[in-house]
Amino acid sequence: MLSSTDLVQAVTADLGKIRETAPLVLSLTNSVVQPLTANLLLAIGAVPAMLNDAEEAVDMLRSGTGALLVNLGTVTREQGAAMQTAVREANRLNIPWVLDPVAVGALSLRTRLAGQLKEQSPRIIRGNASEIMALAGYSSVTKGPESTSSSADALHAARELALHTGAAVLVTGRTDYSTDGRQVTATENGHAMMSRVTGVGCSMGALSAACAAVSPTPLQAAVSTAVLMGIAGEMAFEQSPSPGSFAVSLLDSLYALSPEDVVRRARFLSL
């Protein structure tokens, strides 16, 4: 288990690598969050590519993509087939990919698709408590895409899911938990206003893909995601305490985020 000092150093290293290498993140994501997702990736220093077609996704993966995001937020049967194709190609090319199983457990099409995708070697699975519990095979209660359980409630399911899939699992909530099934890191950065803006959670999936493109391990990428987004959320609220302006300030805060901010603000919870 890394010390808090080691964790902070790893997060700042990931931030620096993203800005130095500008990884291309191919996002097969939902239509509601595409603008925020693309702008968030640009703000942190990555390069977004937003596609839905299977043939074009394969072409993009072969052109030097750093990571792939698969987000099920507004999935259709056609898009689901494209996701399957993209995942197979990413695995063939050894490109890390992230599964964001939005509203899994609440709706049948995406629940079936997520069950298939989780068996195809995602590097990171990012979800709220209800989504992670459902994907792990536990009963959960959702309110649309929102969780009615706490992230701590899903920790056991997250560890089981990580061991089963080989992925790092990032459970987001008031406390964010990152686990590979053996190690667990809990981070307490963030602000409640983040839950009042559509797409922030989904954009964390995109950020985790950017981190996965540069980080030495999926678990470290998950931790970096939680810390960087959480700190940016805190900084954004200090500037803009209302939802509309907060969304803009979140992008500004990610753009301005410095290693010193990480050192000063990162908060890890002892388990």
Swiss-Prot record:
User: Which annotated residues bind substrate?
Assistant: M50, G199
Q: State the Pfam families in the record.
A: HK (PF02110)
GO biological-process terms attached to the record: thiamine biosynthetic process; thiamine diphosphate biosynthetic process
Needs which cofactor? Mg(2+)
User: Its Enzyme Commission number?
Assistant: 2.7.1.50
Which reaction is the catalytic activity of this chain? Answer: 5-(2-hydroxyethyl)-4-methylthiazole + ATP = 4-methyl-5-(2-phosphooxyethyl)-thiazole + ADP + H(+)
Task: Extract the GO molecular function terms from the UniProt entry.
Answer: ATP binding; hydroxyethylthiazole kinase activity; magnesium ion binding
| Xref: NCBIfam families | PRK09355.1
The name of this protein is: Hydroxyethylthiazole kinase
* Encoding gene (name): thiM
